[in-house]
Amino acid sequence: ADIFGPSVPKMFQVEDARPYAEQIDGRDLIIPIEKYGIKLLSIGFFVDPDQATLWRGGMASNALKQLIGDADWGELDYFILDTPPGTSDIHLTLVQTLAITGAVIVSPPQQVALADARKGINMYTNDKVNVPILGLVENMSWFTPAELPENKYFIFGKEGAKQLAEEMNV
């Protein structure tokens, strides 16, 4: 499930797919799009991908609840949610709505982004939330141009997520 954008439809190359509703046990449920054996729902299926999603916290939280609760997910091995960076109403709604068994924090290596990752780790490990951090993934670690495949350019810094993981015992 992807709350704010077209990321999931783009990554799975299903931008033109449209989920539909089906009545199951007297309830109208959204049938997720399925690709590669993975069930997908994203706000990107319901809004124009070129338009900004301008929602206040409550609207975004309600959309998240609908993506989670009003869909026929069936039996799942894992339920993965792509959330925006930081700590927001979305994250609070998530931990209040689902019994979360773990979180994976994704961050590029630059210090500004790592500050958000640090806040996310602190939020999930807070005594009131108590969600274990399963790992910290460094995204956009380096750039390799096609014409120089042996070169790596660390344009956002180097090993920032690794340093944060060590600092926070993740």
PLM features per residue range, with description:
Residues 1-4, 136:
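Walker A/P-loop phosphate-binding motif and the immediately C-terminal alpha-helix
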Residues 3-50:
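Phosphate-binding loop that captures ATP/GTP phosphates
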Residues 4, 60-64, 113:
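Internal, well-ordered alpha-helical segments in soluble enzyme and binding-protein domains
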Residues 8, 41, 64, 82, ...:
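Residue-level signature of catalytic and energy-coupling elements of molecular machines
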Residues 14, 73, 129-131:
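Helix N-cap/coil-helix junction residues
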Residues 18-23, 42-93:
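Switch II (G3) loop of P-loop NTPases
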Residues 77-78, 84-170:
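Conserved catalytic-core segment of NTP-binding enzymes
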